[in-house]
């Protein structure tokens, strides 16, 4: 029995690609046809490749491998956070900071700073400081939580990275390639399948499509670590309203956390 059925994928809109004028010719093998100027993804291939991805994730989870989920677009942010947390994995769902993996030693110092501030908040140590200083430290903590909260327990670079929207997360892709970290990625019709290791042709813009694919990948990790799921989870719908779509084609080479004022 396939991990995802054709009916599930049709219902979730997994088959809808981009407008034909916005395609990447390298995705041609995964495209079934076009309708009204929109490419339609071949769901038979998606089902087969999803089985491959599921088995790959489950097998590596059984071996104790660590996973990082990456998806910073508004539609994906909430799903990435919940599904990664559910299966005990790390995630980035706001902005990818340059050097997140290739300069992990520097990033880890910021993660350690976050944990220190949270500890001081929990113990009441911040309340003992002058009001202005405590306020500044709390603002710093909030900013660090926004960008690094999903990797707070990550001790080293991940073994496998799962990506939603390979084009958007190109900086993450490049860092994975430099470090030879395998990439499992949803690929819409405007993506490049050559830069990922485990492709999953699918609509990476629709919330229901993202939820279906990412949810199944999280299932694979969970089952690899804890055994077969007892029942299918009823995943909450997301509208993405709590996440800002503030992506910029900017690389923060010094792993600097961007100021809130500069995000608009």
From Swiss-Prot:
Annotated region described as Disordered, given as residue ranges: 228-264
Domain of life: Bacteria
InterPro entries: Ribosomal_uS2 (IPR001865), Ribosomal_uS2_bac/mit/plastid (IPR005706), Ribosomal_uS2_CS (IPR018130), Ribosomal_uS2_flav_dom_sf (IPR023591)
Protein name as annotated: Small ribosomal subunit protein uS2
This protein's GO CC annotations: cytosolic small ribosomal subunit
Disulfide bonds, paired cysteine numbers: none
GO MF assignments: structural constituent of ribosome
Annotated organism of origin: Nostoc punctiforme (strain ATCC 29133 / PCC 73102)
Biological process, per Gene Ontology: translation
Family that this chain belongs to: Belongs to the universal ribosomal protein uS2 family.
Compositionally biased tracts (Acidic residues): 230-264
Source taxonomy: Bacteria, Bacillati, Cyanobacteriota, Cyanophyceae, Nostocales
SUPFAM superfamilies: Ribosomal protein S2
Keyword Ribonucleoprotein (UniProt): yes
Keywords (A to Z) from UniProt: Ribonucleoprotein, Ribosomal protein
Matching PROSITE patterns: RIBOSOMAL_S2_1 (PS00962), RIBOSOMAL_S2_2 (PS00963)
Entry coiled-coil feature ranges: none
